[in-house]
Regions:
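Conserved catalytic/acceptor-binding region of the Class I
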Residues: 128-188, 201-210
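Conserved alpha-helix/loop element of class I SAM-dependent methyltransferases that forms part
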Residues: 15-35
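Class I SAM-dependent methyltransferase SAM/SAH-binding core
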Residues: 40-90
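Local beta-strand N-terminus motif with an aromatic residue
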Residues: 36, 96-97
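Conserved Class I S-adenosyl-L-methionine
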Residues: 46-48, 175-242
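A short glycine-rich, Lys/Arg-flanked "PGG" loop and its adjoining helix->strand segment in the class I
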Residues: 113-125
Length: 242
């Protein structure tokens, strides 16, 4: 499991997750969810978002659910932690939640459209589900370079935001917006290492050969100082149980 292997490296490399964890907390402050009812972070990893929420809502305890045991062990000892495969419906004892969050997790799941309906069903009326995930418009530099040199694109194909929420009423969709986030690296070798370090290389394509990597490095668009960029597009969606 990529995520078990990446658990110890995750916190130092997860700048993009940290950035959007802070953004999600800003939204939670504006929404001011009910304090009664459980607050749970789904796919919590080492607890980045859950800790950030607790830092800003000192009276709230956030439960953490993840499918990587190593990731859960990186969390605070005193918090409720559940080891669970999020490809399955949530445990039946979870219900009446006033806040469910999920930062950078849903795109790993086998059937996100189905799973998000299950998560939504666990909310109490007035409760919020907040998710963030990379969209299918991520990594244009990588895709263009592969097209240019006729090499198979081996990155993940992320989600289409309209697809994900197609079963929800427009009144339930409280907020949906895309944000661009740019990472900058010395070269494509460091760029690919970074993708690997957050456990994000789970793709069925063959590993690139040294020759192919050299080609990619040569043709990837360069900045004036010869560095390379990786552009992410991240969607944040807030769904409200009426």
């Amino acid at each position: 499991n990529n995520f078990n292997d990446a658990a110890y490296r995750y916190l130092e490399h997860s700048n993009i997750q940290k950035f959007f964890a802070k953004k999600i907390v800003q939204f939670i402050k504006e929404l001011n969810p009910q304090k009664k009812g459980e607050w749970i972070d789904l796919g919590s990893g080492p607890g980045l978002l859950a800790d950030e929420i607790e830092k800003n809502f000192s009276s709230q305890k956030v439960s953490r659910i993840d499918f990587s045991k190593k990731m859960l062990l990186e969390n605070k000892l005193s918090r409720k932690k559940i080891l669970w495969d999020l490809n399955n419906d949530l445990p039946s004892e979870i219900n009446n939640c006033s806040l469910l969050t999920s930062n950078f997790c849903i795109h790993w799941l086998n059937n996100p459209e189905k799973i998000i309906k299950n998560w939504f069903s666990k909310l109490t009326p007035g409760g919020f589900l907040i998710i963030s995930y990379p969209t299918k418009d991520c990594f244009p530099e990588w895709k263009d370079t592969c097209r240019k040199i006729d090499i198979e694109y081996s990155g993940l194909n992320f989600l289409c935001s309209k697809e994900l929420l197609k079963d929800f009423k427009s009144t339930e969709i409280h907020y949906s917006k895309q944000f661009n986030y740019l990472e900058n690296f010395e070269d494509v070798y460091k760029l690919f290492r970074s993708i690997k370090n957050v456990g994000a290389q789970s793709t069925n394509c063959k590993r690139k050969t040294v020759k192919e990597l050299k080609e990619i490095q040569k043709f990837w668009p360069k900045n004036y100082n010869n560095t390379v960029n990786l552009s992410w597009q991240i969607e944040i969606q807030i769904i409200k149980k009426l």
